[in-house]
């Protein structure tokens, strides 16, 4: 009788331990799932994301998606403004787009390199926000930082999924995470997009988020040197591109993207035109 009672107690202890472990796993999964971000967008400089895919982000936020932007540099080498003014402007743009968060990795503007140090900074962001989709700079562009940033982010997305690469943030070990998709937005060069997103209802918000960078665009009172994006008609050309991509895809305005791999559709329901 005593032996039977002891066996029962032992089994109950094992059961309690199993239940506790299952509960802990459930809690951890719940925590990680609530920390997940739908879209993590990277830009070599503050304003890259707004110019390249601001309309897409505004649209996704309106649909209830969580979007976070990470700027690689402070844009300190920009012809106009300072890193401090651009920091304030980036915060204003984030409010306009409705971002869940915005961070800056403080990499060296003009000298982006695909180094282990820079890769690991990005890996930590990917593991922190755990996005399904990453948006990154154009794969080829006028500014060398853009293509370098695109490759840097792409490599970091792969490395972030390797279990033997360990990272720690705020004293806690991070879980591995690899995004499902990496899409590159268009910038200065007219790269042929592989797909477009309809931003017809969000062009105004895209333009507003760009204009938050007051020091970077047309200002008739400015005494600072001119740049390719400070001309009076720059936003007209930005609007024209969106309009032209929209014309080609059967909508009013659109933003174009390239993909690092072939995109698979479940069906034709999501096709606009």
Question: What residue ranges belong to the model's regions?
Answer:
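A ubiquitous, low-specificity "background" feature that marks scattered single residues
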Residues: 12-20, 27, 54-56, 77, ...
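Metal-dependent de-N-acetylase/amidase catalytic core
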Residues: 29-40, 116-273
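Short, structurally constrained coil/turn elements
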Residues: 6, 63, 98, 176-178
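Short, basic, low-complexity termini and linkers enriched in Ser/Thr/Gly/Pro
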Residues: 1-34
